[in-house]
């Protein structure tokens, strides 16, 4: 029997992205569609275990008010404590960042995808970038680029696995919006 591989995906680490008010909910919806699909088509996973965190920043998605970068009024893109979770992977100030880090470590993934919107690009592992960019029709690939304070940077450095940040083209490009 082949060894199972684990794909770990998290969505909406920013409760707000940059397209419109509370657009992070689109990413949560997309995650839930994937979960529903694979619950009903489990055999398609073959030799994979799929772990999906539909909403890494629930406070930002549900109650956030803006997409400001970390500052004393940032809440939406950032946590209620004004911390951008995807820029917190060195200091781990936010409880959400620590919880996500610990869950990722517990799951022992083989591959990691960090799902965002709406820059039409991938950032990280060149092989994953090629696959994801082709499947989603994304324009830009920033290969082998792992910012140290981003989730993909920490995962790549500490878990030594392929990691990619995926930026959908636009909110209308995800399956739940078509």
Task: Describe the function of each predicted region.
Residues 124, 144-178:
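Active-site-adjacent mobile loop/cap segments within catalytic or ligand-binding domains
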